[in-house]
Amino acid sequence: MGIELLCLFFLFLGRNDHVQGGCALGGAETCEDCLLIGPQCAWCAQENFTHPSGVGERCDTPANLLAKGCQLNFIENPVSQVEILKNKPLSVGRQKNSSDIVQIAPQSLILKLRPGGAQTLQVHVRQTEDYPVDLYYLMDLSASMDDDLNTIKELGSRLSKEMSKLTSNFRLGFGSFVEKPVSPFVKTTPEEIANPCSSIPYFCLPTFGFKHILPLTNDAERFNEIVKNQKISANIDTPEGGFDAIMQAAVCKEKIGWRNDSLHLLVFVSDADSHFGMDSKLAGIVIPNDGLCHLDSKNEYSMSTVLEYPTIGQLIDKLVQNNVLLIFAVTQEQVHLYENYAKLIPGATVGLLQKDSGNILQLIISAYEELRSEVELEVLGDTEGLNLSFTAICNNGTLFQHQKKCSHMKVGDTASFSVTVNIPHCERRSRHIIIKPVGLGDALELLVSPECNCDCQKEVEVNSSKCHHGNGSFQCGVCACHPGHMGPRCECGEDMLSTDSCKEAPDHPSCSGRGDCYCGQCICHLSPYGNIYGPYCQCDNFSCVRHKGLLCGGNGDCDCGECVCRSGWTGEYCNCTTSTDSCVSEDGVLCSGRGDCVCGKCVCTNPGASGPTCERCPTCGDPCNSKRSCIECHLSAAGQAREECVDKCKLAGATISEEEDFSKDGSVSCSLQGENECLITFLITTDNEGKTIIHSINEKDCPKPPNIPMIMLGVSLAILLIGVVLLCIWKLLVSFHDRKEVAKFEAERSKAKWQTGTNPLYRGSTSTFKNVTYKHREKQKVDLSTDC
């Protein structure tokens, strides 16, 4: 069953065509070289698996090797695998013993990876309830923090009370810092050194770098007492030496009292920026910070005037290494600076501090709750050359690609992460890396071991007889030749290294540039496009011309650069069919008799002919009409006149036959109307020589001649009749009009009433007119007499 599943796995890998070609074309000559091509490649160590010259064929996908005949037990194909060494279950609920708490699973494993391959791990993280907390309060005691010092005198009691609601195992400690006590950071006169505040006047302590005052303890009253006894100090410039203090608080694990199984919180309180890196060169301090603990017997930083300030990178390394979570509690003016620092430091948070630190308790509680609501992974160790990618699976199974952080988690919730590890190249050494949650001591230890070797390399036949009289060592199915020998079986000596016999011509490259010359013979390269062959590798089966993207039009085989067409095809591209079926028109004539069939398509030769079978030809007369002149001449002529019709028929390309016994197969029946309106019918046939013959000429349905006298009589009578009818109509219209006028006259005469005294037709001879131009004058009466 196991072998069957393994075979199925190999077959699955082999389904990718692109991958298959990559293995065989990689040019691998050894098993190790084959494995380096990619995780999909395998090597066949079986003896005589291929022709001795075909070493490259041993490297292929497992499926292809099986298909070529390689036995399964000879296939070298190491696969990536995960070996879990330690996988304790995650803790649930409260644990009495903090050493029994497990917050990450698994805890240890070995990862064996093929170069180029990837393996995905599942990592689970759960923050346990009631987890111990160590809080170290690191305070800036420069003169500007005097009011803050007074505010926190009872902080220990109040902080312990609030933290007891979140954990039953809480400890706190105290330390302070100011600045490096060297010029130009402080004044160096004896008075200023003894009392940096003498100019105020006010007494304060001499400037110091860092003092560890109270180790971590659960005695809150002791914390209050220590804070009450603190006095401020002073320096000149605004930035402080806080990063020196952070470094010492992080690395002095024994002095501070950090526990292994607890949450380490470092509360950094200041109202100013901090020096870092090469700022100390202003004071002539040039020795880089070594990241080690330098607290003397008085718990003071003894190398403050010797070592440079730590860089941000050094702080990150030591904070992560010692699982210290940094809480910046700074004033409004400094928030933006420390937010930039926090973006670089894993697990760091920033809180806004009031001028007198009045909100420090709420700030610490809020920062603690924020830290406990987040789960973020960090990677430590030798990761150079490794490719790691993360996918976070947070609340309700929500996926976050390329993220290794879950937010808004509750204590007791489980955050899962998919971690994909990839080695792009083969390495001879193993890698030890650590994947851990930020701020927690729990970690996953991961040993990454490259799988670059083949098992068959362990079995070596030195000076093997399989390698031509012991000229090499036989390993993994191939020979590794001794110096001075070469060839698949080490059969070639230095005297056989000439490549002249591998050249087709003296000026040609060896093996046409497409093969290797072994012992005077060409071993052609493999190609993803096909086979390369020939004594000089001069031939192949893929360099022929293409038609419509297909080699030899898909109708032939490519042989040494030339197309060999299959039956029924011809032409340079094998794209020309010899079949004429597609050229036959509906009447069964090839290209309708108007063209030639070329490569299965009609090429019309008659002017004006077109169509797939040249069936359309507006300028080509039909076969019947083209014979009209011949037929009409034959019917109308008699005796010697018929001889004249022979010439007309020759022009029409036809001959008239009087034979009645002829084959009507393939004949064309024609009907024409002659000049005498008679219907002429005849048949057109073609003899064996392709000549047109006209048979069975008949003239029928001739119309009778017209009766001209009767036509003339009819026309005359019709004209006479039309004239009589028109006269009658005119007479009727005139009579009707006269009667109407007489009736009208009679009606008007009956209505007339004449007066006896005056003739209505009489008009007087005198008319009176008024002069319209006369004004303001005596009225005159002008009588004008006008003759009517």
Curated annotation (Swiss-Prot):
Parts of the chain on the Cytoplasmic side: 731-788
Domain VWFA stretches: 131-371
Family matches, as PROSITE patterns: EGF_1, EGF_2, I_EGF_1, I_EGF_2
GO cellular component: cell surface; external side of plasma membrane; focal adhesion; integrin alphav-beta6 complex; integrin complex; plasma membrane; receptor complex
Top-level lineage group: Eukaryota
Record-linked Gene3D superfamilies: 4.10.1240.30, Cytochrome c1, transmembrane anchor, C-terminal, Laminin, ligand-binding face of the semaphorins, domain 2, ntegrin, alpha v. Chain A, domain 3, von Willebrand factor, type A domain
Disulfide bonds listed in the record: C23-C41, C31-C454, C34-C59, C44-C70, C197-C204, C252-C293, C394-C406, C426-C452, C456-C476, C467-C479, C481-C490, C492-C519, C502-C517, C511-C522, C524-C537, C539-C560, C544-C558, C552-C563, C565-C574, C576-C599, C583-C597, C591-C602, C604-C614, C617-C620, C624-C670, C630-C649, C633-C645, C678-C702
Keyword Hydrolase: no
Residue sites binding Ca(2+) 2 per the record: E179, N235, D237, P239, E240
Main location: membrane
Parts of the chain that traverse the membrane: 710-730
SUPFAM superfamilies noted in UniProt: EGF/Laminin (SSF57196), Integrin beta tail domain (SSF69687), Integrin domains (SSF69179), Plexin repeat (SSF103575), vWA-like (SSF53300)
Disorder noted: Amelogenesis imperfecta 1H: A disorder characterized by defective enamel formation, resulting in hypoplastic and hypomineralized tooth enamel that may be rough, pitted, and/or discolored.
Purpose: Integrin alpha-V:beta-6 (ITGAV:ITGB6) is a receptor for fibronectin and cytotactin. It recognizes the sequence R-G-D in its ligands. Internalization of integrin alpha-V/beta-6 via clathrin-mediated endocytosis promotes carcinoma cell invasion. ITGAV:ITGB6 acts as a receptor for fibrillin-1 (FBN1) and mediates R-G-D-dependent cell adhesion to FBN1. Integrin alpha-V:beta-6 (ITGAV:ITGB6) mediates R-G-D-dependent release of transforming growth factor beta-1 (TGF-beta-1) from regulatory Latency-associated peptide (LAP), thereby playing a key role in TGF-beta-1 activation. (Microbial infection) Integrin ITGAV:ITGB6 acts as a receptor for Coxsackievirus A9 and Coxsackievirus B1.
The protein, known as: Integrin beta-6
Annotated organism of origin: Homo sapiens
